[in-house]
Structure formats: C-alpha cells, structure tokens
Amino acid sequence: MYDASDPFYMVMQKYNMKRGNTMIKAGIIGATGYAGAELVRILMNHKEVEIAWYGSRSYVDENYADIYGNMFQIVDAKCMDDNMEELAESVDVIFTATPQGFLAGVLTEDILSKVKIVDLSADFRIKDVATYEKWYKIEHKSPQFIDEAVYGLCEINRDKVTKETRLVANPGCYTTCSILTAYPLVKEGLIDTDTLIVDAKSGTSGAGRGAKTPNLFCEVNESMKAYGVASHRHNPQIEEQLGYAAGKEILINFTPHLVPMNRGILATEYATLKKKPDGTLPTYDEIKAVYDKYYANEKFVRVLKKGVCPETKWVEGSNYVDVNFVIDERTGRIIMMGALDNLVKGAAGQAVQNMNLLFGFDEAEGLNMVPMFP
C-alpha cells in the first residue's frame, strides 16, 4: 500500500477523489487476446484497481462477455477502440497486449506524460534498435523511448521499476522462463555461457487467439514440433539480459517447441560447469546455495527439492516459476529446468506485478492464485 505521507500518494489520492473513488483506473488495449483476457481475470481480483477500458480494435461496441463467455454476468462492459490519446486522459495505467509495432507506432511524449504504460509486446524490450529491426523485421517508430523503458523482469530489475518509471517493457514468456532458470549461475560465473543451450516447450496459447492453420486442433493434437529454429524472436532478448548478468556478450542456441496443451512453458537448459580451483565440479549443495541466494526470498520463484523436476501443471493459472537443476558429473554439465504459465508469469501476471511496483502496491497484490490441479 501507499505510505500516506508520500507526496506521490497524496497526488494520486487527490486525482482519484476527483473521480469519486480511491482506486486507480486501468485500461487494456488488446483485451480480447489471450494475454489481455488474462489481465482482465487478474485485475478483477485486484483490490486497488478498476478496469475502465476494455480495448479491442476487432470487437468495438461488442459486449466483452459475449466474446469471453466465462465473463458472463461478471463483466458488464463493451469493448472500446485503441485510441491511446483518449485513453491516457482517462486512466492511470495502460496495458498494451498488442502485436509488435503497435505501441511504438502511436507512443508520444504527451501520452507518456499523462499515464504509465506496461507494454506486453516486444517494442521496448531490446535496447539496440538495429537488433530489434533485424529480428522483428519492422522499423521501430519510437526509438527515442527505448532508453527509458525498463525491462520488467521483476526478480532481476525490481529496483528499476519505481513510481518514477513511465514505461515498462514486460518480458516475453520464453524469455522469462529461460532467463530466471539460468540467471543465478550466469551471474555468479559458474557456467561456461558459450555452451548454453535452451530447449523450451510451449502450449498453443502462446501463439495467440487468431485462427491459424498450424494451430488448429487436428494440426496440434498428438503432435509436437520445433519451430523458429535458430530464428525465434525471443533469442536476442535472452542473450541481451543474460549478457548483462555475465558482463559480456552471450550467444545461445534457443529452440522452442509447440506441444499439445493450452498453457505452460517448460525450459530445459544445458551448460558446461566451470571447475573449482581444485579441479572438481561444484557440488549440489554449492549450486543450491547460489539459487537460494537469489530466489529464497522471492515470492514467485520456487526452487524445488532435490530430484524434483518442474512440471507445467504445478504452475498452471499462477504467477509462479518453478526451477531446479541436476548436475551430470559424467559430462561435467548442468541441466537447469524451469516451468511457468505463459499467460500469467509469462505475460499478464508479470505485467500486474510490474504495475504493483509502479504504484507502490504490495508486489503480490492480485497475484496470490493457487496453481490449478489437475
């Protein structure tokens, strides 16, 4: 909660009192996509937030509950357009759950001066414009805002997401899982990052709600395939963020796979362990101590017990990331594993986590969902 003596709090209170409430107002652009719908579900249980704008270019003036039947008699609102200028005048925070290029194409200093933005697209995740344009194959329309955008991986950049922050680049699903799984060992220099391989599996919701032949039931069911091999757009994000941790440029092999389930990501990562001065490999207890150093006090990262491998089912519908590792003494390599729900911690949940930091709320507010099982 806010500190009542905080000037920021007092300004917000005066602002909200003019509108007859003490809750902040949120607008969602892309509210009818899977990540946008998950934002709606989470924010409806957030005691500090009122959703004031269900933005959807495809469904303007249609009842939101007619699009998502699970919201029948829960959401009584019509979809609105994606007019960012009008929205910035009406709310305190905007979530843009939109395709790449949307926010960069409409963002102005005037908009940013009026409202905080949590962007779930990749427009401001990569600091190098040329790298963004190479991997996404579009021109970046607002490079002037890249430097100030904070990469909102909360467990790593929490101190940078503050009340003064205007723009948060919410990390992607594969990137969140891949980075958090390896981050402690990269940061502490315990693995040879030149040998790092990331093998990841995702459910079909990661491809979005749009109808595409490769994502039809008969195409996906009872099948599994690699895609974006050596070319997936999350590759440079993982390299950039782990490169910051390592203090040097990192190149990785990242291969995503599509599996026949609705939600979830499982990342299995491999790297050669660096030997200790005495020529031996780090022990299980030594590696476990490193993970505990970074994650023991983290609400949403769970380091599992020895011998327990993460499963997507154990995090489904929640904001948790489960991680663990196994040392292969025969090869001198370590196998790191991580699992999360791609729509929650991999998208909407992390976006709300960032919003909580932006407004000084309890970081876990609205996010204490118990994973669904079975």
Regions found by a protein language model. Name each.
Residues 40, 179-186, 235-239, 288, ...:
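Predominant activation on well-ordered alpha-helical scaffold segments within soluble catalytic domains
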Residues 48-90, 194-200, 204-336:
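C-terminal substrate-binding/catalytic lobe of Rossmann-fold NAD(P)-dependent oxidoreductases
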Residues 175, 276-277, 341:
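Short strand->helix junction
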